[in-house]
C-alpha cells in the first residue's frame, strides 16, 4: 500500500514538472480578446458577488497576461539586467486599496505589471497596462525621492544638452512624442526662473508613455512592439542612471 501511495506521489510530481515545462515553452505574443471581455464585464459589475462567481474566469485571464509577461521578461533579460523573477511576479493585484478613495468599487478594471531593473546603478523601470480603451506602456520616474529630484535638477542645470539630445532624437519623438510628467508652475527653490533649461528643471516626474489600441494589443506583433518600445527607453534610462550615480564632476557617488 505504501509503495502504491509513493508511486502516486512520484507520478503527481512528474506531471507537475511536465506542466511547468510546457508553460515555460509557451510563448504568449499578444493579449487575448478574452482578457478585454472579462475586464469590460468587471467594469460593469464591479462588486464582490459578481467577482466570486467569475473568479475562475479571472484566474484564466490573469494567467494569460502572466504568460505574456513571462515571454516579454525572457526577451528583456537578454538585453537588460532585470531583477523581476517571473511574469506572474510582475503583475499587480487586482484588488484596490479603497481606504482613501471616494470610489469604493473593490477591483481595478485593468491588469498591469512592472519589471524592475537590478542594482542601484540601473535606474528606471518598465510598466505595461492592459485596460479596454486604455492600453499603454510606461517607464521612467513616477515619484523620485526629494534627494534624487534635486540631484536630477542640478545635473540638468549644469548641462542640459545630453537630455535635450535624447528628447529630440527621431526614435524618441516617433515612439513617445515628448517627456511626460507633472511640472512646477514656477522655478523650484534655488533655481533661476530664467535658466535656459527651466522647462526641464521644472519637471517633478520624468515619464515615457506610448499608447496602444486594444486591437494592437491583441495582435501577434504586440510582443515585438512592446519590446521595441522598452528598448527605445534605454538611452533615457542610461542618461538618468549616469547622472543619479555620479556627482556634478562625474565622480561616482
Go through each PLM region and give its residues.
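Hydrophobic/aromatic-rich structural module bridging two neighboring secondary-structure elements via a short loop
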Residues: 77-121
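Long, solvent-exposed, polar/charged low-complexity segments
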Residues: 22, 26-44, 48, 65-69, ...
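Compact, glycine/acidic-enriched structural inserts
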Residues: 131-185
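Active-site acidic/histidine clusters and adjacent loop/turn architecture
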Residues: 40-94
